[in-house]
Amino acid sequence: MKELPYTPKAVIGRREMVTLPEMGMTVCAKIDTGARTSALHAEDIEIDEEEGHLWVSFITRSGGQETPPHHFRTHLHDRRRVTSSNGHKEWRYVIRTPLQLGKLEMMVELTLTDRRNMRHPMLLGRRALRRLLVAPGVTFLHGEP
């Protein structure tokens, strides 16, 4: 068997509770090694410019539509063309924000998209999962919901 070129920081399950401290919320994230980028549910996305900087405002929810909305405003990091799992291509806004997963802390890039018809409000893709090992047979290794 080939050895890993690095020592993994942690083993995570196929679903994990993650905290977005700047947003003041904890969400259940689906771990998706097939997705390159991570995504966060966002509604009512608006872009504005202030003192030469672009800002993005949006509403997100820690669960389904029945959970209270979180209003958030942050710097717009980028705008990227993303291909969804069904092959549909769309432009999405990208933000950078700290993320906590158990004792791990990292900066992640999140694309903003409407995930209200999805089971999980957040998807963690390969870029956020660098140096982590995924155990697909288990869930919530870093804390129960």
Regions found by a protein language model. Give the residues of each.
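Pepsin/retropepsin-fold aspartyl endopeptidases
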Residues: 1-145
